C-alpha cells in the first residue's frame, strides 16, 4: 500500500505577520491584534516579540498590557488577511486540489498523487514556502509526513519559518519523542492527568496499559493510543457544500469558569461577523450554533432557530446553557450559524 504524502502548512502569527509586512517598523516591537484594554476585549494573535512576555492569543487585552506595558495593540484588517489567505490557497492549488482549510492561515494538503517535483512532498513544501514568502510576503512553517497528525506536529516542531519532514522510516521514532501536549485535544487538565500516570511523551503513552488510559479518558483513549503510535487514517477532506459558517478557538489555558468564557465571546463573535462580511449567507441563516468542549474532552452543542433579527445576546444565553451542562473548565468554544439551502430559507436578518 502506498504511503500518503501529507503537508500541513501553518502561517507564523498570521495576522501580526501581515501587519509587520505592511509596516516594517512593527517587526522588532511587541505587538498584537485585538481590541482596546478598556472593556472586555481579547487578542486574536501576537507576534513573537510579544510572546516572549507571555502574551498569547485569546488573552484579555488588559492582562496582556500588564504583562507587557509596551505592547502595541492594533485592530487589524480582516479583508487584508482574507486576501493573503486567498493568495496562499492559489499557490496550494498549483500542486493539488485536495486541500482541507483549517482556518485562513492553516491547511492540510494531500500531494500523494501530485506530479510536481517528481512527486517529492518535501520539494513541494519547500516550493510552497518559498512562493508564499515571495508573493505574500510572510513566512509559513510546514510539516511533511504520511498522515495529518504527524504532519501537524511536524509543522510546529521548528517554528517560525521551519520545515520538518518525517519519513515513514523515522515516523515511530519521531512520534515517540513528541510531548503529549502536542496531541490534539490534550489541554492543561489532561496533561496533569497524564502526568499523574507518568505520561509525558508519546513513548510513555505507548507503554501505558490501555485499560488504565481508558479509565481516565473514556472514549478518547483509543484515539490517543493511536496517535501515540503515529497512526492516523483521517483523510484530507475537501468541503464541497457549506452547511454552516462558524469560528472556534482552542485555548492554550483552560477557561476556569463562566465569567472567563463570557469574556472571550466578543472576539469570537467579531471574527464570525468578519468571516461573513461580503458573503451572501444572511438569507440562508437558519439556526444559532454554539459548541463547548470541556477539559474532560466531553463536548456539548446547542442550536436555536433564528426567529428574529440576529442578536449577540442569544450566543451569551446559549453559552450559559452549555456551560451549565458540565460546569467544568473549558478548552474550546465555537460559535456560528447553521445554513439552509437558499431556496428553503429566504429571511433577511440584519445584525443589530
UniProtKB/Swiss-Prot annotation:
Protein name: DNA polymerase IV
Record localization: Cytoplasm
Active site per database record: 106
InterPro entries: DNA/RNA_pol_sf (IPR043502), DNA_pol_Y-fam_lit_finger_sf (IPR036775), DNA_pol_Y-fam_little_finger (IPR017961), DNA_polymerase-Y (IPR050116), DNApol_IV (IPR022880), IMS_HHH_1 (IPR053848), Rev_trsase/Diguanyl_cyclase (IPR043128), UmuC (IPR001126)
Record carries keyword DNA-binding: yes
Enzyme class: transferase
Major localization class: cytoplasm
Record's subunit section: Monomer.
Cofactor note: Binds 2 magnesium ions per subunit.
Gene3D superfamilies: 3.30.70.270, 3.40.1170.60, 5' to 3' exonuclease, C-terminal subdomain, DNA polymerase, Y-family, little finger domain
Biological process annotations from GO: DNA-templated DNA replication; error-prone translesion synthesis; SOS response
Matching PANTHER family: DNA POLYMERASE KAPPA (PTHR11076:SF33), DNA REPAIR POLYMERASE UMUC / TRANSFERASE FAMILY MEMBER (PTHR11076)
Pfam name, any one: IMS
PROSITE patterns membership: UMUC
Amino acid at each position: 500500500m502506498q504511503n500518503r504524502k501529507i503537508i500541513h502548512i501553518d502561517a507564523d502569527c498570521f495576522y501580526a505577520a501581515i501587519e509587520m509586512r505592511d509596516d516594517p517598523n512593527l517587526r522588532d516591537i511587541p505587538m498584537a491584534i485585538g481590541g482596546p484594554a478598556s472593556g472586555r476585549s481579547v487578542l486574536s494573535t501576537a507576534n513573537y516579540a510579544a510572546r516572549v512576555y507571555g502574551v498569547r492569543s485569546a488573552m484579555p487585552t488588559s492582562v496582556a498590557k500588564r504583562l507587557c506595558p509596551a505592547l502595541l495593540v492594533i485592530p487589524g484588517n480582516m479583508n487584508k488577511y482574507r486576501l493573503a489567505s486567498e493568495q496562499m490557497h492559489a499557490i496550494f492549488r498549483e500542486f493539488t486540489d485536495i486541500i482541507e482549510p483549517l482556518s485562513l492561515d492553516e491547511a492540510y494538503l494531500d500531494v500523494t498523487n501530485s506530479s510536481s517535483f517528481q512527486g517529492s512532498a518535501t520539494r513541494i513544501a519547500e516550493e510552497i514556502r518559498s512562493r508564499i514568502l515571495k508573493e505574500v510576503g510572510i513566512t509559513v512553517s510546514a510539516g511533511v509526513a504520511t498522515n495529518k497528525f504527524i504532519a501537524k506536529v511536524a509543522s510546529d516542531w521548528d517554528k517560525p519559518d521551519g520545515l520538518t519532514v518525517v519519513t515513514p522510516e523515522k515516523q515511530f521514532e519521531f512520534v515517540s519523542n513528541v510531548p503529549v501536549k502536542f496531541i490534539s485535544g490534550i489541554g492543561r487538565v489532561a496533561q496533569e492527568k497524564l502526568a499523574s500516570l507518568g505520561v509525558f511523551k508519546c513513548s510513555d503513552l505507548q507503554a501505558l496499559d490501555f485499560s488504565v488510559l481508558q479509565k481516565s479518558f473514556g472514549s478518547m483513549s483509543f484515539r490517543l493510543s493511536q496517535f501515540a503510535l503515529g497512526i492516523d487514517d483521517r483523510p484530507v477532506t475537501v468541503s464541497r457544500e457549506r452547511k454552516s459558517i462558524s469560528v472556534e478557538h482552542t485555548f492554550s489555558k483552560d477557561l476556569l469558569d463562566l465569567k472567563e468564557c463570557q469574556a472571550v465571546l466578543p472576539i469570537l463573535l467579531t471574527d464570525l461577523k468578519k468571516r461573513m462580511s461580503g458573503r451572501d449567507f444572511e438569507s440562508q441563516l437558519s439556526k444559532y450554533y454554539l459548541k463547548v468542549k470541556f477539559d474532560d474532552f466531553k463536548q456539548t452543542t446547542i442550536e436555536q432557530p433564528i426567529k428574529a433579527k440576529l442578536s449577540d445576546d442569544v450566543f451569551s444565553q446559549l453559552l450559559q446553557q452549555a456551560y451549565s451542562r458540565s460546569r467544568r473548565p473549558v478548552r474550546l468554544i465555537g460559535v456560528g450559524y447553521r445554513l439552509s439551502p437558499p431556496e428553503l430559507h429566504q429571511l433577511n436578518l440584519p445584525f443589530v
